Structures are given as structure tokens and as C-alpha cells.
Curated annotation (Swiss-Prot):
The gene is trpA. It is an enzyme of class 4 (lyase). One of its GO terms (molecular function) is tryptophan synthase activity. The alpha subunit is responsible for the aldol cleavage of indoleglycerol phosphate to indole and glyceraldehyde 3-phosphate. NCBIfam families: trpA. Pfam families: Trp_syntA. Its EC number is 4.2.1.20. This is Tryptophan synthase alpha chain.
Length: 257
């Protein structure tokens, strides 16, 4: 069974998924970060594929992507790192990246490499839903890779229902249409959006991402979904703390404050 499917079958709520950029802060940090996240009880990991024009990301992840590329990170290298560490890491791993580097690698080859490396799913923020259905879904399904699609407060109910019907794993509920980055709290407008999506009774579980960095935003996310995705906050901590384990500890502390 796909590890993402298994996670949502065994853990119905309070799921914490953490994002980091491959190759940041150092080229060969992937294994130590993954092991630290698993050791501290993180349920799922999103590994970012660095790209030179990350349009959905805020300044923290943009800077991390730039540094990772300078460090020499590539898809070929990342797949090698994941293959080496997979036997020691049991939690689901999702690759998150923009379409350009994936297409340069070749989508069919990308999916095959994901399977070899033990990757369970992918998030491609700039892949339009219609293109996914027409050109990518059959290939991803053949490799048992979950394609996780994003929805925002601006996504129509019709589109949300189509995404729910034609994808599996979970739906990535973006807290706002802006870029990633920390927020102090989710205002009433955002919480109304969360409630509206809940009222649709979708078949897929949902995780809330973008802007989660403290107790208030984390608790709001898990109150309205199966869990939360944290990225920018953890990427900042990887830079400021001495080790990945200390960065995870600081992250978990922040979610209690």
C-alpha cells in the first residue's frame, strides 16, 4: 500500500507534514534532515526540488532554493540520496517541485525514479489540473504515485470537486492565494474558507499549508483538516540551528507557543 494512503488510514487527524528544500543548507543534508524528522515523530515529509524561479514561494524558500542550486543540488543527485536513505526512513516522502525541472528530466523517467527511490507522491504547484488529467495522470497512476493538487480560497467549487474525484492521497488546502511564509494567525475570512471546504464533504482528506508557524495557526489548521504542512518556518530553523535535530525541536516548541 502507498505510504500516504496508509498514513491517512491509520492517523485521522493531527498530522504534521514538514517541508524542506533538498540541498539546503548543505548539499548532503537530505539524509540527516529526514532521519531527524522521523525520529521526532513527524508524520510525513515534503522534499522541495530547488528551482531558479519558485513563483509560489516566499523569500525564505526562494533563498533556500537559490542556495541549494549553488550547492550543486540536482534531481539526479536527490534521487541518489533518497535511494540510499529510504531503508532507514519509513514515513511517506513527497517530492514538491515546479514543472520545468521535472519536464527537463522527463516525466515518465521522473516517476520511475520516484518509485526506485521510495517516493510516495508529488506536488507540482504550476501543473494545471486540465494538463494533469490529459497528459500526466495515467503515468502517475501506473507508478502508484499520488499527485497532490492545491486548492486556494479562489478555487471554484466545481474545480475542487473535480480534483477530489480524480486525485487521491490528500488535498493541499492553501491558506491564502499569496506566497508561502509565516503568519501570526488565520483571520475569520480564512477560517470561513476552511469551514466552507469542510462542508463539501470531500472524499479525500485535507492538509492546510502556507503560513503555519505557531500554536495559533497550527491549532486552526488541525481544527479544520486532518493536519498541517509547515515549510518556511522549518527552513528558517535549518539555517539558524546547529543540527537538523535541533531545528525540529525548535519547530515543535514553536507550535506550542
Amino acid at each position: 500500500m502507498n505510504r500516504i494512503t496508509n498514513l491517512f488510514q491509520t492517523q485521522k487527524d493531527g498530522i504534521l507534514s514538514v517541508y524542506f528544500t533538498a540541498g539546503y543548507p548543505n548539499l548532503n543534508d537530505t539524509a540527516s534532515i529526514l532521519k531527524a524528522l522521523q525520529a521526532k515523530g513527524i508524520h510525513m515529509v515534503e522534499v522541495g526540488i530547488p528551482f531558479s524561479d519558485p513563483m509560489a514561494d516566499g523569500p525564505v524558500i526562494q533563498e533556500a532554493a537559490t542556495q541549494a542550486l549553488r550547492n550543486g543540488m540536482s534531481l539526479h543527485l536527490l534521487f541518489g540520496q533518497l535511494r540510499e536513505i529510504r531503508s532507514e526512513v519509513q514515513i511517506p516522502i513527497i517530492l514538491m517541485g515546479y514543472l520545468n525541472p521535472i519536464m527537463q528530466y522527463g516525466f515518465e523517467k521522473f516517476c520511475a525514479s520516484c518509485v526506485e527511490a521510495g517516493v510516495d507522491g508529488m506536488i507540482i504547484p504550476d501543473l494545471p489540473y486540465a494538463d494533469y488529467i490529459a497528459d500526466y495522470k495515467e503515468i502517475a497512476d501506473r507508478h502508484d504515485l499520488k499527485m497532490i493538487m492545491l486548492i486556494t480560497p479562489e478555487t471554484s467549487e466545481e474545480r475542487i470537486r473535480l480534483i477530489d474525484a480524480h486525485t487521491s492521497g490528500f488535498i493541499y488546502m492553501v491558506s491564502s492565494a499569496a506566497t508561502t511564509g509565516a503568519q501570526q494567525d488565520f483571520n475569520e475570512q480564512k477560517q470561513a474558507y476552511f469551514r466552507r471546504i469542510n462542508a463539501m464533504n470531500l472524499q479525500n482528506p485535507r492538509l492546510v499549508g502556507f503560513g503555519i508557524s505557531n500554536k495559533a495557526t497550527f491549532e486552526a489548521a488541525i481544527a479544520h483538516s486532518s493536519g498541517a504542512i509547515i515549510g518556511s518556518k522549518f527552513v528558517q530553523l535549518l539555517k539558524s540551528e546547529a543540527t537538523p535535530a535541533e531545528a525540529v525541536d525548535k519547530l515543535l516548541e514553536a507550535l506550542k507557543q
